[in-house]
Amino acid sequence: MSTFKLLKTLTSRRQVLKTGLAALTLSGMSHAVAKEETLKTSNGHSKPKTKKTGSKRLVMLDPGHGGIDTGAIGRNGSQEKHVVLAIAKNVRAILRNHGIDARLTRTGDTFIPLYDRVEIAHKHGADLFMSIHADGFTNPKAAGASVFALSNRGASSAMAKYLSERENRADEVAGKKATDRDHLLQQVLFDLVQTDTIKNSLTLGSHILKKIKPIHKLHSRTTEQAAFVVLKSPSIPSVLVETSFITNPEEERLLGTTAFRQKIATAIANGIISYFHWFDNQKAHTKKR
């Protein structure tokens, strides 16, 4: 029986906390490395394989929406789910060219529940998780890119609150309701390490924004925060990138061009690479102390 299956059977939060601490200490939160063809998760949790020391860094890219969930739709009919999948595939290609193992939560037009997207990242032992979207808003004049990290203290702005509530309703499109089933351990471990994880997520967001700024308008110059379900990973730095507002006619046009999708993908990938360089420098500096 896997650690996660065992912990799910415990009824006391205190028992889960104690066992989770032991698992965290003994395993160092080891994650799985699996083939990309088996990315989709089911309700059954397969036993994870231990990630080998010295293995490539792994970035899990999550193209938002998919299948029955189209995401936002532009005035001319562009669907968010298709645009962000194309961008995510471009980011994957760029990262792989830089020696980084990049994978997608979905490679086609399929629906994946929000919590499953988080679990996919953990099962593959991801070092980073990035959900890629294209904003939809009631005001067609809203424009620019934004980056969001998780918040456990409320949204950092009215826009952040609006977008997180909208994205968190994605499962309802497929008749599913987000529940806490099978996620008690995840919540407990999140409570244990959330401070460092959110801090690193905010840093990752700042690196991405710096790379996007020269090539595209920013809707927000700092990493926003809100309670996005898809960012609720206990130990993996996670951000949600809203590449543009697909409900803005001009930005819908841009998102429909191969050139812009490649340009924004390059900026995102360079932001990830920049973050890894920063992280390595921080780690080296800490060791010297």
Curated annotation (Swiss-Prot):
Gene3D superfamilies listed in its UniProt record: Zn-dependent exopeptidases (3.40.630.40)
Catalytic reaction equation(s): Hydrolyzes the link between N-acetylmuramoyl residues and L-amino acid residues in certain cell-wall glycopeptides
InterPro entries: MurNAc-LAA_cat (IPR002508), N-acetylmuramoyl_amidase_3 (IPR050695)
Location of the MurNAc-LAA domain: 59-273
Chain positions covered by the region annotation Disordered: 36-61
One Gene Ontology cellular component annotation held by this UniProt entry: outer membrane-bounded periplasmic space
UniProt keyword terms in alphabetical order: Cell wall biogenesis/degradation, Hydrolase, Periplasm, Signal
GO terms, molecular function: N-acetylmuramoyl-L-alanine amidase activity
Localization annotation: Periplasm
Post-translational modification comment from the UniProt entry: Predicted to be exported by the Tat system. The position of the signal peptide cleavage has not been experimentally proven.
GO terms for biological process, alphabetical: cell wall organization; FtsZ-dependent cytokinesis; peptidoglycan catabolic process
Signal peptide: 1-34
Extent of Basic residues compositional bias: 46-55
PANTHER family named in the record: N-ACETYLMURAMOYL-L-ALANINE AMIDASE, N-ACETYLMURAMOYL-L-ALANINE AMIDASE AMIA
Annotated function: Cell-wall hydrolase involved in septum cleavage during cell division.
Entry protein name: N-acetylmuramoyl-L-alanine amidase AmiA
